[in-house]
């Protein structure tokens, strides 16, 4: 069933399914693909089964839905599901997928409630103001508690849940849901079928009172978010289903409420109403409206693009994937205009022209080649050579740069040593391909040892990348022990440090004099590091304008190798105060060398310190082991931030240096007889205590 791709944009939904790693996201997505498949295959379950089997092979390889965007159809609406990874090491992937979504469904584990990773993803969704609804899953499991999960959404996510459904029955007796908008019951009876059919019934008598109470709460919450509802509610008038649905949609799109539904995807209960809600309450590309980018020449000049085919083409490359049969596929969200196979576009970030090869729409288990695609759609494209994740593609005559994405710097690195000469060559290809796909994966070579060093967001992140090198690129390599990616910065201001570079060898010499000041670069609002900053204070042409960028470049190059132990320096403000030049002997190179050396000398006097990555760690443990766990965290130089009771267990939140967390999995297991679990994510950089810093510096210097 190839549907004409020029779908009415009102009927398109670009959604993400976001969740903690075990909340049942893949199962939910799989069931969505299964039911949406049924609507066109009229119950040919063997095809549905084929889709499912195909998904399971993918899961064996540990990937959640092969495709970065899967298109399916529900009640003549096109739903593009954009996958978001659930593990904290892949925050870059989450950021990137949120950037191209219009709305999201957050899946919660009905037993565990709101988990740390859910909070991280939720915060990222707040940053991009993504309208979202919630699906409380796994209500058939022992210990599942829908109402506690809703309370946690308020406490931990600071959200305004709008409960649209209540569970009927609990744990193994979970039968279905009460629909509070239509005031009816939806039940899925009998385990034998795949849950395609459900009954619409009267609300069971024993739930009538609870349903009335929650219907009242629904109206109260809606009236606070919507003036029209408020007026009618205060006058005591009744609402039609259509009026309520329109109000829920308005409040959801304004990000004032988050509709909450429930069910169990694994037992096939509650998925169709979830799809209905996606269509009814989440935004279409038209609701999101125009996207604002900036001009190629001037970052401060705003350029807008409306989601219409008549506008000039603009799109964002948000994911690169390697397809075993097709090679490199780049996923693009088209924001405006049309994208046609065979056309030429320009990469607005690097200025290169790109020819669009084939354009594919990705379905659950097949890809469909299409000739062209309009605004608001998400497709995969072949044939692009110089485009990376986060780049903008646009009409050559009307260029625009869409907001680029910022990714955190890697915090952990390992040395990787290919076993043979042929592995060396394959490693180069693998690294190139993987760093194209993943901007948080970086590579450098150690100048002293000549080793290749790869860096990423956590141990799991690097393990998966090394595993992919082995499997996809057949690279056999030995991998060193993980090392922490330290940084350096300064704590004191040094004013008017002078350095003169001169060299006289036959012919023209080199001459440059610079006077610089260094100081810590701090953001006054957050009191955290504000990155590198260069200020030019030179007046009266004492350093010609064309040489000033060279001083800046020299200082930045000096920052790549800090003065303490050669780690990259961060958060330094450099001010060029004065200088001198020579008509014949001065050059860009001379000023670059002067800037570089002046920076190094001044940095040594500016009280340089070592910084280390701190991780926010959350440990869940039975109370009997509480003292042991806290003692262990303290011994790792951790700072306990909070502890609370949750479902009979104790949950400890702490900030711990990454260098002290290696091997924590095994230690925690043995100290708590395997009964405790933990999760961790990067938080910030903090100063290393003097005694430990001295040891690290000695080790690096080989003393």
Curated annotation (Swiss-Prot):
Function in brief:
Catalyzes the GTP-dependent ribosomal translocation step during translation elongation. During this step, the ribosome changes from the pre-translocational (PRE) to the post-translocational (POST) state as the newly formed A-site-bound peptidyl-tRNA and P-site-bound deacylated tRNA move to the P and E sites, respectively. Catalyzes the coordinated movement of the two tRNA molecules, the mRNA and conformational changes in the ribosome.
User: tr-type G domain: which residues?
Assistant: 10-286
| CDD domains (UniProt xref) | EF-G, EFG_III, EFG_mtEFG1_IV, EFG_mtEFG_C, EFG_mtEFG_II
Which SMART domains does its entry note?
Answer: EFG_C, EFG_IV
State the protein's name.
Elongation factor G
UniProt-annotated binding residues for GTP? 19-26, 83-87, 137-140
| Pfam families documented for this protein | EF-G_D2, EFG_C, EFG_III, EFG_IV, GTP_EFTU
What organism does the UniProt record list as the source?
Nocardioides sp. (strain ATCC BAA-499 / JS614)
Q: What is the lineage of its organism?
A: Bacteria, Bacillati, Actinomycetota, Actinomycetes, Propionibacteriales
- Which biological process annotations from GO are given for this protein? ribosome disassembly
Query: Which InterPro entries does this UniProt record tie to the protein?
Result: EF-G-like_DII (IPR053905), EFG_II (IPR041095), EFG_III (IPR009022), EFG_III/V (IPR035647), EFG_IV (IPR047872), EFG_V (IPR035649), EFG_V-like (IPR000640), G_TR_CS (IPR031157)
Compartments, as annotated in UniProt: Cytoplasm
Listed A to Z, the keywords are: Cytoplasm, Elongation factor, GTP-binding, Nucleotide-binding, Protein biosynthesis
An annotated GO cellular component of this protein is:
cytoplasm
Please provide, alphabetically and separated by semicolons, the GO molecular function terms listed in this UniProt record: GTP binding; GTPase activity; translation elongation factor activity
Name the HAMAP family on file: EF_G_EF_2_B
* Gene name as annotated: fusA
Family from the record: Belongs to the TRAFAC class translation factor GTPase superfamily. Classic translation factor GTPase family. EF-G/EF-2 subfamily.
User: Is Protein biosynthesis tagged as a keyword?
Assistant: yes
């Amino acid at each position: 069933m190839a549907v004409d791709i020029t779908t009415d944009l009102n009927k398109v939904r670009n959604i993400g399914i976001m969740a903690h790693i075990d909340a049942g996201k893949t199962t939910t997505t799989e069931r969505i693909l299964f039911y949406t498949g049924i609507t066109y295959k009229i119950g040919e379950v063997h095809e549905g089964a084929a889709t499912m089997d195909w998904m399971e092979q993918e899961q064996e390889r540990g990937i959640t839905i092969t495709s970065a965007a899967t298109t399916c159809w529900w009640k003549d609406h096109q739903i593009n599901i954009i996958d978001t990874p659930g593990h904290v090491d892949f925050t870059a992937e989450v950021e990137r997928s949120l950037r191209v979504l219009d709305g999201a469904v957050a899946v919660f584990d009905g037993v565990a409630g709101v988990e740390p990773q859910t909070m991280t993803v939720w915060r990222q969704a707040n940053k991009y103001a993504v309208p979202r609804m919630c699906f409380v899953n796994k209500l058939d499991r022992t210990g599942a508690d829908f109402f506690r999960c809703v309370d946690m959404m308020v406490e931990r996510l600071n959200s305004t849940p709008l409960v649209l459904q209540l569970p009927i029955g609990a744990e193994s007796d979970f039968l279905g849901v009460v629909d509070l908008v239509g005031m009816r019951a939806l039940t899925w009876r009998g385990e034998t079928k795949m849950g395609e059919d459900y009954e619409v019934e009267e609300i069971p008598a024993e739930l009538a009172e609870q349903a009335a109470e929650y219907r009242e709460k629904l109206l109260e919450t809606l009236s606070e978010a919507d003036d029209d509802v408020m007026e009618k509610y205060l006058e005591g008038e009744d609402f039609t289903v259509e009026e309520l649905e329109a109000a829920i949609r308005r409040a959801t799109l304004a990000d004032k409420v988050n509709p909450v539904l429930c069910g169990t995807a694994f037992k096939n209960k509650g998925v169709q109403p979830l799809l209905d809600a996606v269509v009814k309450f989440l935004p279409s590309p038209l609701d999101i409206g125009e996207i604002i980018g900036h001009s190629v020449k001037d970052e401060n000049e705003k350029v807008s693009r409306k989601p219409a085919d008549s506008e000039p083409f603009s799109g964002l490359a948000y994911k690169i994937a390697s397809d075993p049969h097709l090679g490199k596929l780049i996923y693009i969200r088209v924001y405006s205009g049309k994208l046609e196979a065979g056309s030429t576009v320009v990469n607005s970030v690097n200025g290169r022209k790109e020819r669009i090869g084939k354009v594919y729409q990705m379905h659950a288990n097949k890809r469909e080649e299409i000739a062209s695609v309009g605004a608001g759609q998400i497709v995969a494209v072949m044939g692009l050579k110089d485009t990376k994740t986060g780049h903008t593609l646009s009409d050559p005559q009307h260029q625009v740069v869409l907001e680029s994405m910022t990714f955190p710097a890697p915090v952990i690195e390992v040395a990787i040593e290919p076993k043979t000469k042929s592995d060396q060559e394959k490693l180069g290809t693998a690294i190139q391909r993987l760093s194209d796909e993943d901007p948080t994966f970086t590579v450098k070579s150690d100048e002293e040892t000549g080793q290749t060093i790869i860096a990423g967001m956590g141990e799991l992140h690097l393990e998966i990348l090394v595993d992919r090198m082995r499997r996809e690129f057949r690279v056999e390599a030995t991998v060193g022990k993980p090392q922490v990616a330290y940084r350096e910065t300064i704590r004191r201001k040094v004013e008017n440090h002078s350095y003169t570079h001169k060299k006289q060898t036959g012919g023209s010499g080199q001459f440059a004099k610079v006077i610089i000041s260094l100081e810590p670069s701090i953001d006054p609002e957050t009191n955290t590091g504000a990155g590198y900053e260069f200020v030019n204070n030179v007046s009266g042409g004492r350093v010609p304008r064309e040489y000033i960028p060279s001083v800046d470049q020299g200082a930045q190059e000096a920052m790549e190798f800090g003065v303490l132990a050669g780690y990259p320096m961060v958060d330094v403000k450099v001010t060029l105060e004065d200088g001198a030049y020579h008509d014949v002997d001065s050059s860009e190179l001379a000023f670059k060398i002067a800037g570089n050396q002046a920076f190094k000398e001044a940095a040594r006097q500016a009280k340089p310190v070592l910084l280390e990555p701190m991780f926010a760690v959350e440990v869940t443990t039975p109370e009997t082991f509480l003292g042991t766990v806290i003692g262990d965290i303290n011994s790792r130089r951790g700072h306990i931030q909070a502890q609370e009771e949750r479902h009979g267990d104790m949950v400890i939140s702490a900030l711990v240096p990454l260098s002290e967390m290696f091997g924590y999995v095994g230690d925690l297991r043995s100290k708590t007889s395997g009964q405790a679990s933990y999760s961790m994510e990067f938080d910030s950089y903090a100063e290393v205590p003097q005694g430990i810093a001295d040891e690290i510096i000695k080790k690096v210097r080989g003393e």
